[in-house]
Swiss-Prot record:
No effect on activity by SDS or chelating agents ethylenediaminetetraacetic acid (EDTA) or sodium citrate. No effect on activity by metal ions Ag(+), Ba(2+), Ca(2+), Co(2+), Cu(2+), Mn(2+), Ni(2+), Pb(2+) or Zn(2+). Activated by 1 mM digitonin and sodium deoxycholate, and reducing agents 1 mM 1,4-dithiothreitol, beta-mercaptoethanol and ascorbic acid. Activated by benzene, n-hexane, p-xylene and toluene. Activated by Fe(3+). Inhibited slightly by 1 mM of different chain length fatty acids, and only marginally by 6.0 M urea. Belongs to the AB hydrolase superfamily. This is Cutinase. Optimum temperature is 60 degrees Celsius with p-nitrophenyl palmitate (p-NPP) as substrate. Hydrolyzes p-NPP in the broad temperature range of 20-80 degrees Celsius. Highly thermostable. Stable at 50-60 degrees Celsius retaining 90-100% of activity after 3 hours. Has a half-life of over 30 minutes at 70 degrees Celsius. Disulfide bonds join C289-C305. Keywords: Disulfide bond, Hydrolase, Lipid degradation, Lipid metabolism, Secreted, Serine esterase, Signal. The gene is cut1. Residues 1-47 form the signal peptide. The lineage of its organism: Bacteria, Bacillati, Actinomycetota, Actinomycetes, Pseudonocardiales.
Length: 309
């Protein structure tokens, strides 16, 4: 966005048998073994792993890396071939053996095009998502319009795009920068079936999001003078329902335009949030809970732990 003038894991349950001592324990073992042989009764199988997990077990290094474990490719979508938004670029994992993937659309900010947030496309896709960085109908579209366009792009992605067979249409999210971040909030409020929302240094005149039901990570920038956190990101976060899975991450010393270039802090927490809630991948909970401490890159972090989703 250019400057605004105003604006189950495998932990299956098993029945515990009280510990027996001496000959009683041995006798019990013989009886149980005999029963298993004569009746064909076997121990319960462990619960299946989360079917939506994609990729190896995450580490700090893997979520901070500029690329993940999946090779990716792209599809260019012309604005002339779609309606309701301005086209864009789809980034997707090329594998056909890992099942379907969750998907998300990312919207740019005021006066900006998809190029301003393009770095997030391959970065997130290589971690196991189908990612659609979009252009808006006009670069001056306001947040409510950008929200509708995010939803239109998701509908195209899951219903008409050439990669639709690679997508699980029940696992979708939205991300956006500045007015695109405002659009992210608008889209999440309009479509509560979304699994995750991440507004990045968002700008919106609406400050009350108490009816929003989608797990939301609000990312603000400490030195933002376009959408100051005191009047944008913090009120957005505090207005979200206290029972909602929500978090507020503030980038230390960063400007409004921090999301327009590769940023490790933005990437690692956006990825962790999307994995945790779009994929229900609790392997990523460790990076979100306990609440991350302030650091050289984080000036504030708030949230509710543990997460409900």
């Amino acid at each position: 966005m250019s400057a605004l003038t105003s604006q189950p894991t495998s932990s299956g349950s098993s029945e515990k048998i009280p510990r027996l001592r001496g000959w009683r324990a041995k006798a019990a073992g013989v009886v149980l073994a005999a029963l298993a042989l004569t009746t064909g009764v076997a121990a319960p199988a462990p619960a299946a792993a989360n079917p939506y997990e994609r990729g190896p077990d995450p580490t700090t290094a893997s979520i901070e890396a500029t690329s993940g474990s999946f090779a990716t490719s792209t599809v260019t979508v012309s604005r002339l071939a779609v309606s309701g938004f301005g086209g864009g670029t789809i980034y997707y994992p090329t594998t056909t053996t890992a099942g379907t993937f969750g998907a998300l659309s990312i919207a740019p900010g005021f006066t900006a095009t998809q190029s301003s947030i393009a770095w997030l496309g391959p970065r997130l896709a290589s971690q196991g998502f189908v990612v659609f960085t979009i252009d808006t109908l006009t670069t001056s579209d306001q947040p409510d319009s950008r929200g509708r366009q995010l939803l239109a792009s998701l509908d195209y992605l899951t219903q008409q795009s050439s990669v639709r067979s690679r997508i699980d249409s029940t696992r979708l999210g939205v991300v956006g920068h500045s007015m695109g971040g405002g659009g992210t909030l608008e889209a999440a409020r309009s479509r509560p079936t979304l699994q995750a929302a991440v507004p990045l240094t968002a700008w919106d005149l609406t400050k009350n999001w108490s009816t929003l039901q989608v797990p939301t990570l609000v990312v603000g920038a400490q030195s933002d003078t376009v959408a100051p956190v005191a009047s944008h990101s913090i009120p957005f976060y505090t207005s979200l329902p206290s029972t909602l899975d929500r978090a507020y991450l503030e980038l230390r010393g960063a400007s409004h335009f921090a999301p327009n270039s590769p940023n490790t802090t933005i990437a690692k927490y956006t990825l962790s949030w999307l994995k945790r809630f779009i994929d229900n991948d609790t392997r990523y909970e460790q990076f979100l809970c306990p609440i991350p401490s302030t650091s050289l890159s984080i000036s504030d972090y708030r949230g509710n732990c543990p997460h409900n989703g």
